């Protein structure tokens, strides 16, 4: 469907399927992705990994991840989320200043169609990162300062604070 002529936006995308028994796991699943993305400047790709590329690999060009799998472990969930958070930049973009760096991916996104699961994972992970913190809200606040949570509410996109995350998650 993505390649259909009438689908003006998506028709230029290449879908890479890194799934199934023959795909490998981690670095072994990466070559078809790298081949499709190339440098990342003139390609449009969607990678379907089904858990094959969630730990141990980094694809700097990835700008978002769509979570569909019901991961129980916050560590596994965030390993997948952090794959997309890796920086993508080039040093000395104009060839005249070796100290200059151009950021090519200033933001990234994690989309999850199970918001309660996502917020539960976020709260458990935040609390786990700060075992000495007596107030769970403070622990989660620290995490969301690096990983803000946005929610679509009708026609508006709003940021959810640590208290809101805990209210929904618990």
List the predicted regions and their residue ranges:
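Conserved strand-helix element at the start of the C-terminal RecA-like helicase core
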Residues: 1
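Long, largely alpha-helical accessory region at the distal end of helicase-like NTP-driven motors
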Residues: 114-170
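Conserved RecA-like P-loop NTPase helicase motor core
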Residues: 8, 13-133
């Amino acid at each position: 469907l993505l390649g259909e002529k009438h689908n003006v936006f998506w028709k230029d995308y290449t879908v890479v399927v890194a799934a199934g028994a023959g795909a490998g796991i981690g670095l072994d699943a990466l070559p078809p992705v790298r081949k499709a993305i190339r440098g990342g400047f003139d390609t449009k790709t969607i990678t379907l990994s089904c858990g094959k590329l969630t730990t141990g690999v980094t694809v700097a060009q990835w700008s978002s991840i769509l979570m569909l799998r019901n991961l129980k472990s916050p560590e596994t969930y965030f390993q997948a989320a952090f794959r997309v958070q890796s920086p993508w930049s080039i040093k000395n973009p104009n060839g005249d200043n070796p100290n200059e760096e151009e950021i090519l991916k200033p933001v990234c996104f994690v989309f999850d169609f199970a918001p309660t699961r996502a917020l539960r994972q976020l709260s458990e992970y935040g609390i786990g990162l700060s075992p000495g913190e007596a107030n769970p809200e403070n622990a989660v606040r620290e995490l969301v300062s690096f990983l803000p949570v946005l929610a679509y509410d009708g026609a508006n996109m709003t940021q959810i604070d640590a208290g809101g995350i805990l209210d929904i998650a618990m």
